[in-house]
């Protein structure tokens, strides 16, 4: 049992928690720079190589809920990481490379690390093995220049996907502008993100995510922060105010298990989670982890390690 904001969550009762599961998700209710470095250490492995990328969302101005640079600074500098992101495909202040660099500066990310827009020079294709919707995934052209990726995600709702977590961060988040269009339309359009069907879209996210993990041969780790739990994504510059308290930080080597654990925690919270649950259910958000498990991206069952116990 953990208590956050006066609300109690029974960790042992999380729907997909299984002590015999092969995937482990680490959890702490503390949200602090120290907790970020501690949960990374708890993983028992590190992203390795000379060049490490830290993937996150830079956040759409003026008031999105992107991760606070002060929260992640120590961890980013510990791994000597370069913060990376890709341009958006739907307009806004991050659809243009020069403007995106300015947003990263304005939001404080360039104060803590180097920053690179991965698709400022276009796309590179990654093969999608075993995909039902995609045969290729177009990521930023500079994606292959990094040996390992540390993926820092802010878990929250999303207007189109229903939720945004680790899988979204490595699929839509690492997709070039052209790649984002392919994912949104399940491979039908290279130049427009609009008009796709919902389940093929979320299946494409899982398939694009798997292509990223496959290309890195597992040299990728995931940390998700469950704070500012709005129904809206950080691509929304004016998100709805959260109805619920912050939950904590989770980490795993398995993005499917990590996203599933975040969903389970939302459902298990005794807080007012109705708006976020409605957003997820109205978009069939859970389908991204269902498909992710089916294609071998990860497992929905996980063993939860409570670092506060």
Features from the language model and the residues they span:
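Universal eukaryotic N-terminal targeting presequences
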Residues: 1-3
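Extended, low-polarity segments enriched in aliphatic/aromatic residues
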Residues: 6, 14-309
């Amino acid at each position: 049992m953990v208590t956050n904001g006066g609300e109690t969550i029974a960790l042992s009762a999380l729907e997909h928690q299984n002590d015999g599961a092969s995937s482990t998700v680490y959890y702490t209710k503390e949200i602090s720079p120290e907790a970020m470095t501690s949960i990374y250490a708890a993983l028992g492995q590190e992203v390795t190589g000379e060049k490490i990328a830290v993937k996150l969302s830079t956040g759409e101005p003026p008031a999105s809920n992107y991760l606070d640079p002060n929260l992640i600074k120590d961890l980013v500098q510990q791994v000597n990481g370069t913060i990376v992101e890709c341009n958006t495909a739907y307009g806004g202040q991050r659809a243009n490379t020069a403007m995106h660099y300015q947003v990263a500066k304005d939001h404080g990310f360039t104060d803590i690390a180097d920053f690179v827009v991965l698709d400022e020079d276009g796309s590179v294709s990654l093969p999608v093995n075993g995909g039902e919707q995609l045969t290729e995934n177009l990521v930023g052209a500079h994606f292959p220049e990094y040996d390992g990726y540390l993926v820092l995600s802010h878990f929250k709702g999303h207007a189109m996907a229903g939720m945004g977590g680790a899988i979204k961060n490595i699929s839509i988040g690492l997709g070039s502008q052209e790649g984002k269009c392919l994912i949104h339309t399940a491979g039908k359009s290279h130049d427009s993100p609009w008009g796709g069907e919902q389940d093929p879209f979320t299946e494409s996210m899982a398939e694009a995510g798997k292509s990223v993990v496959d290309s890195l041969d597992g040299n990728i780790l995931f940390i998700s922060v469950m704070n500012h739990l709005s129904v809206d994504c950080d691509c929304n510059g004016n998100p709805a105010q959260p109805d619920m308290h912050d939950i904590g930080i989770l980490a795993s080597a398995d993005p499917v298990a990590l996203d599933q654990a975040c969903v389970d925690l939302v459902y298990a919270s005794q807080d007012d989670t109705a708006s976020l649950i409605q957003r997820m259910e109205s978009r069939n958000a859970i389908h991204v982890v269902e498909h992710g498990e089916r294609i071998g991206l990860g497992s929905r069952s996980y063993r939860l390690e409570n670092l506060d116990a």
